[in-house]
A protein has these predicted regions:
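Non-catalytic, solvent-exposed segments at the cell envelope interface
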Residues: 1-333
Length: 333
């Protein structure tokens, strides 16, 4: 799981106190030599369970409530998949990372400069239209702009995946252990991970190089909804969420599932797709695969496990909030 936290730069001095506004689930399969990146919409309405209490809230608030551990658990429940490793970086870390690899090349598809200065005056970098070589400050702006994008946050997420892909390509082109160590050291104060990043692990990462050369990109989307609390949320449909779950499972070599298990609040409440055990208020029951959520690793595996991790155990649900006139069409990946 890749998480970007909206802190650590400009006036947001605390490096980790904020929301995980970027959440991308990455699968790397050295057997198929393919990688997937699935962006998760930050405003998806989910049931977040912590210390025995469940609240309905936006997906990105799980990190603010309980740090990386709760964020991982919540996303694990959302997608009904075990997540064993994570990398989290804040805004300053992204700037440092892009600068350390010597900048990246992106394509601004708009006929105007990409800028966030109007809403965030402390960030003055701009990206001109067309193909551009950009530095770290520009990469941060390129990854954060959404108000001028016709696709809003979904457009921003596309650019975030583009930036990650370009960074990966640049890092792999270096093909040097000393370069890798230097890159990691440069962002160490602004990155958190449960992956050991010693020399042995970095050498093992080279074994994933072929898989990282082919990256497929997906997007978990929802429908716009204004709820009783006045907040704007994204609410997923059963069919779309099940499709995304199976895309991820296929990438990991797991069997396709027919029954949706999730902690998301569903727009349609499709009884044929969702977990057969639901509350009297018709709120989906949150579930997760039985496996450790958060743990330290001494080294990377040579080949990721493709085995299912066990029986799905339901958690408690909460009373639903009725959406007001949400769109009825299903989002596509």
């Amino acid at each position: 799981l890749l998480m970007g936290v909206d802190t650590g730069s400009g006036s947001r001095e605390d490096p980790w106190a904020g929301n995980s506004d970027t959440m991308i689930l990455v699968t790397v399969n050295p057997q198929t030599k393919e990688t997937t990146m699935t962006s998760l919409e930050r405003d998806i309405l989910t049931n977040i369970t912590s210390d025995g209490e469940t609240v309905q809230a936006k997906l990105n608030s799980a990190y603010a409530q309980g740090g990386a551990k709760l964020a991982i658990k919540t996303i694990q429940d959302l997608l009904n998949i075990h997540i064993d490793r994570y990398v989290m970086i804040n805004m300053k870390g992204l700037v440092q990372l892009v600068d350390k690899v010597g900048g990246i090349t992106v394509n601004n598809p708009f006929d105007f400069d990409i800028s966030i200065e109007e809403n965030e005056p402390e960030y003055t970098a701009k990206i001109a239209p067309g193909r551009q070589e950009i530095n770290g400050d520009q990469a941060l702006v390129y990854s954060r702009m959404r108000y001028q994008d016709p696709e809003g946050d979904y457009g921003r997420q596309k650019r975030q995946r583009e930036v990650i892909k370009k960074i990966v390509e640049k890092v792999l082109s270096l093909n040097s252990l000393s370069h890798y160590k230097g890159i990691i050291e440069s962002v160490s104060d602004n990155m958190q991970t449960n992956i050991s990043l010693d020399s042995n692990s970095l050498l093992q990462l080279l074994g994933y190089k072929d898989a990282l050369s082919t990256i497929h990109q997906y997007q978990l989307k929802g429908e716009d909804a204004t709820l009783a609390d006045g907040g704007s949320y994204q609410i997923v449909t059963s069919k779309h969420l099940l499709k995304i779950q199976n895309i991820i499972r296929k990438a990991l070599g797991k069997k396709e599932i027919k029954t949706l298990k999730t902690n998301a609040y569903l727009l349609d409440g499709d009884e044929e797709l969702k977990n057969s055990s639901s509350s009297k208020n018709d709120t989906p029951v949150a579930t997760s695969e039985e496996a450790p959520v958060y743990q330290e690793y001494n080294q990377l595996p040579v080949v990721p496990s493709t085995q299912d991790t066990g029986v799905v155990t339901p958690q408690s649900s909460v009373a639903p909030v009725t959406p007001v006139a949400p769109a009825a069409t299903e989002s596509s990946s």
